[in-house]
Amino acid sequence: MNLDDIAKRTFLVIGRVGMDLSPDPPGARTKDATQMVVAMGGSSANIAAGLVKLGCKAALVTCVSDDAIGWYCLNQLDHYGVDRTYVKKITGE
């Protein structure tokens, strides 16, 4: 199997999506950082995004909170082209 064969496939990835905060400048200790860089986190979400980047179709099965962090995660999944049909918003947590 080569990369062209993989790119024709559809993947269903089960796991977490989240928001990563990294200190800026890189290498700074978190407690000393004056700025933070925000990025999509969660190994499953990043795997799904990587599969899409390789030309595959990928959907993520997960839950997100119905708040600013959850909305950020949904926007990032859209940005990377990950199908979020199976992403459920959880309220009241």
Put a short name on every predicted segment.
Residues 2-83:
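Glycine-rich phosphate/adenosyl-contacting loop at the front of the ribokinase-like
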Residues 86-93:
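A short, structured active-site edge motif that brings together acidic residues
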